[in-house]
Amino acid sequence: VTVKTEKMKKVKVNAYQVGLVFKNGVYQRMLKEGSYWFWSNETVQLYDMTKPFNAPVELNILLKDAALAEALLVLDVKDNEIALQYKNGLLEAVFGAGRYTFWKGAVEYKFVKADIGKIEITEPVERSVLLHRLVAPFVRSVSVESFEKAVLFIDGKFERVLQSGVYYWWKNAIAVHVGKIDTRQQQLEINGQEILTKDKAALRINAWAQYRVTDIEKALLQNKEYDKQLYVAFQLALREYIAGFSFDELLEVFWE
Protein backbone atom coordinates (compact mmCIF):
# COMPACT_ATOMS: atom_id res chain seq x y z
CA VAL A 1 0.00 0.00 0.00
CA THR A 2 1.40 3.34 -1.04
CA VAL A 3 0.39 6.36 0.96
CA LYS A 4 0.97 9.70 -0.73
CA THR A 5 1.78 12.42 1.74
CA GLU A 6 0.92 15.95 0.65
CA LYS A 7 3.49 18.48 1.69
CA MET A 8 2.56 21.75 3.34
CA LYS A 9 4.30 25.08 2.94
CA LYS A 10 4.81 27.91 5.36
CA VAL A 11 4.10 31.53 4.47
CA LYS A 12 5.04 34.50 6.60
CA VAL A 13 3.09 37.76 6.37
CA ASN A 14 5.25 40.61 7.63
CA ALA A 15 4.20 43.84 9.27
CA TYR A 16 2.40 46.20 6.85
CA GLN A 17 1.69 43.30 4.55
CA VAL A 18 -1.57 41.56 3.65
CA GLY A 19 -1.93 38.09 2.20
CA LEU A 20 -4.74 36.89 -0.02
CA VAL A 21 -5.35 33.14 -0.05
CA PHE A 22 -6.53 31.35 -3.19
CA LYS A 23 -7.50 27.67 -3.42
CA ASN A 24 -7.43 26.22 -6.90
CA GLY A 25 -7.53 29.79 -8.16
CA VAL A 26 -10.58 30.81 -6.12
CA TYR A 27 -10.28 33.52 -3.45
CA GLN A 28 -10.68 32.22 0.11
CA ARG A 29 -9.68 34.77 2.74
CA MET A 30 -7.36 37.59 3.81
CA LEU A 31 -4.35 37.16 6.08
CA LYS A 32 -2.86 39.71 8.44
CA GLU A 33 0.63 39.70 9.98
CA GLY A 34 1.74 36.23 11.11
CA SER A 35 2.95 32.78 9.95
CA TYR A 36 0.64 30.28 8.23
CA TRP A 37 0.73 26.75 6.77
CA PHE A 38 -0.93 25.83 3.48
CA TRP A 39 -1.57 22.82 1.28
CA SER A 40 -0.04 22.64 -2.17
CA ASN A 41 -3.33 23.56 -3.88
CA GLU A 42 -3.40 26.84 -1.97
CA THR A 43 -1.48 29.94 -2.96
CA VAL A 44 -0.87 33.20 -1.13
CA GLN A 45 -0.30 36.56 -2.78
CA LEU A 46 1.39 39.16 -0.58
CA TYR A 47 0.71 42.90 -0.85
CA ASP A 48 2.56 45.94 0.49
CA MET A 49 0.05 48.05 2.43
CA THR A 50 1.98 51.24 1.66
CA LYS A 51 1.25 50.87 -2.05
CA PRO A 52 -1.98 50.92 -4.10
CA PHE A 53 -3.78 47.58 -4.36
CA ASN A 54 -4.16 46.06 -7.82
CA ALA A 55 -6.80 43.36 -7.58
CA PRO A 56 -5.66 40.00 -9.06
CA VAL A 57 -9.30 39.11 -9.84
CA GLU A 58 -12.54 41.06 -10.23
CA LEU A 59 -12.59 43.56 -7.35
CA ASN A 60 -16.31 43.14 -6.70
CA ILE A 61 -15.71 39.46 -5.93
CA LEU A 62 -13.03 40.32 -3.38
CA LEU A 63 -15.21 42.98 -1.76
CA LYS A 64 -17.77 40.33 -0.84
CA ASP A 65 -15.32 39.38 1.91
CA ALA A 66 -16.31 41.77 4.71
CA ALA A 67 -12.85 41.65 6.31
CA LEU A 68 -11.11 42.56 3.05
CA ALA A 69 -13.69 45.23 2.22
CA GLU A 70 -13.07 46.81 5.62
CA ALA A 71 -9.30 46.83 5.01
CA LEU A 72 -9.56 48.58 1.64
CA LEU A 73 -10.27 52.17 0.69
CA VAL A 74 -12.08 52.19 -2.65
CA LEU A 75 -11.99 55.38 -4.71
CA ASP A 76 -14.49 55.73 -7.56
CA VAL A 77 -13.80 58.62 -9.94
CA LYS A 78 -16.57 59.44 -12.41
CA ASP A 79 -16.33 60.82 -15.93
CA ASN A 80 -15.58 64.57 -15.89
CA GLU A 81 -13.97 64.15 -12.47
CA ILE A 82 -10.45 64.03 -11.15
CA ALA A 83 -9.33 63.02 -7.68
CA LEU A 84 -6.37 64.63 -5.94
CA GLN A 85 -4.53 62.19 -3.70
CA TYR A 86 -2.69 63.54 -0.68
CA LYS A 87 -0.27 61.17 1.02
CA ASN A 88 0.81 62.17 4.50
CA GLY A 89 -0.36 65.72 3.74
CA LEU A 90 1.44 66.10 0.40
CA LEU A 91 -0.05 65.91 -3.08
CA GLU A 92 0.99 62.55 -4.45
CA ALA A 93 -1.09 61.87 -7.56
CA VAL A 94 -4.07 62.92 -9.65
CA PHE A 95 -6.48 60.24 -10.86
CA GLY A 96 -8.83 60.39 -13.83
CA ALA A 97 -12.03 58.41 -14.29
CA GLY A 98 -11.80 54.86 -12.93
CA ARG A 99 -11.74 52.76 -9.75
CA TYR A 100 -8.73 52.74 -7.44
CA THR A 101 -8.04 50.82 -4.23
CA PHE A 102 -5.68 51.46 -1.34
CA TRP A 103 -4.94 49.77 1.95
CA LYS A 104 -6.08 51.45 5.13
CA GLY A 105 -3.87 51.88 8.16
CA ALA A 106 -0.32 52.06 6.80
CA VAL A 107 -0.51 55.43 5.05
CA GLU A 108 -2.67 58.46 5.77
CA TYR A 109 -4.57 59.19 2.56
CA LYS A 110 -6.80 62.13 1.74
CA PHE A 111 -8.72 62.52 -1.49
CA VAL A 112 -10.33 65.64 -2.94
CA LYS A 113 -12.64 65.06 -5.88
CA ALA A 114 -13.19 67.82 -8.42
CA ASP A 115 -15.85 68.14 -11.09
CA ILE A 116 -13.86 69.38 -14.08
CA GLY A 117 -16.93 69.34 -16.31
CA LYS A 118 -17.78 72.81 -15.04
CA ILE A 119 -15.86 76.08 -15.18
CA GLU A 120 -15.70 77.42 -11.63
CA ILE A 121 -13.31 75.79 -9.17
CA THR A 122 -15.54 75.38 -6.13
CA GLU A 123 -13.55 72.57 -4.51
CA PRO A 124 -11.22 73.22 -1.53
CA VAL A 125 -8.03 73.32 -3.60
CA GLU A 126 -5.33 75.85 -2.77
CA ARG A 127 -3.71 78.03 -5.44
CA SER A 128 -0.34 76.35 -4.89
CA VAL A 129 -1.98 73.01 -5.69
CA LEU A 130 -3.60 74.39 -8.84
CA LEU A 131 -0.12 75.40 -10.01
CA HIS A 132 1.35 71.98 -9.18
CA ARG A 133 2.68 70.12 -12.23
CA LEU A 134 0.18 67.29 -11.65
CA VAL A 135 -2.86 69.59 -11.52
CA ALA A 136 -1.84 72.40 -13.91
CA PRO A 137 -2.82 70.43 -17.07
CA PHE A 138 -6.45 70.50 -15.85
CA VAL A 139 -6.47 74.25 -15.11
CA ARG A 140 -6.60 77.42 -17.20
CA SER A 141 -5.89 80.86 -15.82
CA VAL A 142 -5.86 84.52 -16.76
CA SER A 143 -4.24 87.52 -15.10
CA VAL A 144 -5.92 90.93 -15.04
CA GLU A 145 -3.40 93.64 -14.16
CA SER A 146 -4.05 96.45 -11.68
CA PHE A 147 -4.56 98.93 -14.56
CA GLU A 148 -6.95 96.62 -16.43
CA LYS A 149 -10.53 95.46 -16.35
CA ALA A 150 -11.84 92.46 -18.23
CA VAL A 151 -15.05 90.81 -19.35
CA LEU A 152 -15.59 87.07 -19.14
CA PHE A 153 -17.45 85.18 -21.87
CA ILE A 154 -18.46 81.53 -21.40
CA ASP A 155 -19.55 79.68 -24.54
CA GLY A 156 -19.81 83.06 -26.25
CA LYS A 157 -22.15 84.52 -23.63
CA PHE A 158 -21.19 87.45 -21.41
CA GLU A 159 -20.82 86.25 -17.83
CA ARG A 160 -19.38 89.06 -15.70
CA VAL A 161 -16.78 91.82 -15.35
CA LEU A 162 -13.41 90.80 -13.90
CA GLN A 163 -11.51 93.18 -11.67
CA SER A 164 -7.72 93.03 -11.28
CA GLY A 165 -6.43 89.68 -10.04
CA VAL A 166 -5.58 86.14 -11.14
CA TYR A 167 -8.46 83.85 -12.07
CA TYR A 168 -8.45 80.06 -12.36
CA TRP A 169 -10.97 77.77 -14.07
CA TRP A 170 -11.11 74.08 -14.90
CA LYS A 171 -9.92 73.30 -18.41
CA ASN A 172 -12.52 71.47 -20.48
CA ALA A 173 -14.55 71.71 -23.69
CA ILE A 174 -16.44 74.81 -22.51
CA ALA A 175 -15.19 77.88 -24.39
CA VAL A 176 -13.82 80.63 -22.15
CA HIS A 177 -12.77 84.02 -23.52
CA VAL A 178 -11.53 87.05 -21.61
CA GLY A 179 -11.50 90.51 -23.19
CA LYS A 180 -9.27 93.09 -21.48
CA ILE A 181 -9.16 96.88 -21.51
CA ASP A 182 -6.42 99.21 -20.28
CA THR A 183 -8.14 101.69 -17.92
CA ARG A 184 -5.21 104.12 -17.80
CA GLN A 185 -5.36 107.45 -19.60
CA GLN A 186 -4.39 106.96 -23.24
CA GLN A 187 -3.64 109.23 -26.17
CA LEU A 188 -5.19 109.11 -29.63
CA GLU A 189 -3.34 110.86 -32.46
CA ILE A 190 -4.40 112.00 -35.93
CA ASN A 191 -1.55 112.98 -38.23
CA GLY A 192 -1.69 114.72 -41.61
CA GLN A 193 -5.48 115.02 -41.75
CA GLU A 194 -6.55 117.18 -44.72
CA ILE A 195 -9.52 119.41 -43.74
CA LEU A 196 -11.25 122.38 -45.39
CA THR A 197 -12.03 125.52 -43.39
CA LYS A 198 -15.28 127.47 -43.71
CA ASP A 199 -13.71 129.59 -46.44
CA LYS A 200 -12.42 126.47 -48.26
CA ALA A 201 -8.79 126.79 -47.22
CA ALA A 202 -7.14 123.34 -47.29
CA LEU A 203 -5.23 122.53 -44.13
CA ARG A 204 -3.16 119.51 -43.08
CA ILE A 205 -3.88 119.04 -39.38
CA ASN A 206 -2.08 117.06 -36.68
CA ALA A 207 -4.18 116.59 -33.54
CA TRP A 208 -4.34 114.45 -30.43
CA ALA A 209 -6.85 113.67 -27.72
CA GLN A 210 -6.65 111.93 -24.36
CA TYR A 211 -9.24 109.43 -23.18
CA ARG A 212 -9.85 106.83 -20.50
CA VAL A 213 -12.25 103.88 -20.63
CA THR A 214 -14.59 103.97 -17.62
CA ASP A 215 -17.36 101.62 -18.78
CA ILE A 216 -15.87 98.34 -19.98
CA GLU A 217 -19.24 96.77 -20.73
CA LYS A 218 -20.21 99.64 -23.02
CA ALA A 219 -16.79 99.61 -24.69
CA LEU A 220 -16.60 95.87 -25.37
CA LEU A 221 -20.19 94.65 -25.41
CA GLN A 222 -21.96 97.49 -27.18
CA ASN A 223 -19.20 98.40 -29.62
CA LYS A 224 -17.06 96.45 -32.05
CA GLU A 225 -13.43 97.61 -31.97
CA TYR A 226 -14.26 100.62 -29.83
CA ASP A 227 -10.81 102.17 -30.36
CA LYS A 228 -11.32 102.32 -34.13
CA GLN A 229 -14.78 103.81 -33.65
CA LEU A 230 -13.29 106.37 -31.27
CA TYR A 231 -10.68 107.28 -33.90
CA VAL A 232 -13.41 107.83 -36.52
CA ALA A 233 -15.49 109.89 -34.06
CA PHE A 234 -12.41 112.02 -33.31
CA GLN A 235 -11.85 112.56 -37.04
CA LEU A 236 -15.45 113.66 -37.59
CA ALA A 237 -15.41 115.96 -34.57
CA LEU A 238 -12.15 117.52 -35.74
CA ARG A 239 -13.51 118.09 -39.25
CA GLU A 240 -16.69 119.63 -37.86
CA TYR A 241 -14.71 121.90 -35.55
CA ILE A 242 -12.26 123.14 -38.22
CA ALA A 243 -15.05 123.62 -40.77
CA GLY A 244 -16.74 126.06 -38.40
CA PHE A 245 -13.94 128.61 -38.75
CA SER A 246 -12.37 130.56 -41.56
CA PHE A 247 -8.61 130.38 -41.97
CA ASP A 248 -8.09 133.75 -40.28
CA GLU A 249 -10.42 132.81 -37.42
CA LEU A 250 -8.45 129.62 -36.82
CA LEU A 251 -5.22 131.58 -36.63
CA GLU A 252 -6.77 133.81 -33.98
CA VAL A 253 -7.97 130.76 -32.00
CA PHE A 254 -4.61 128.99 -32.13
CA TRP A 255 -2.64 132.11 -31.20
CA GLU A 256 -4.80 133.07 -28.23
Predicted feature descriptions by range:
Residues 1-256:
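N-terminal hydrophobic membrane-entry segments
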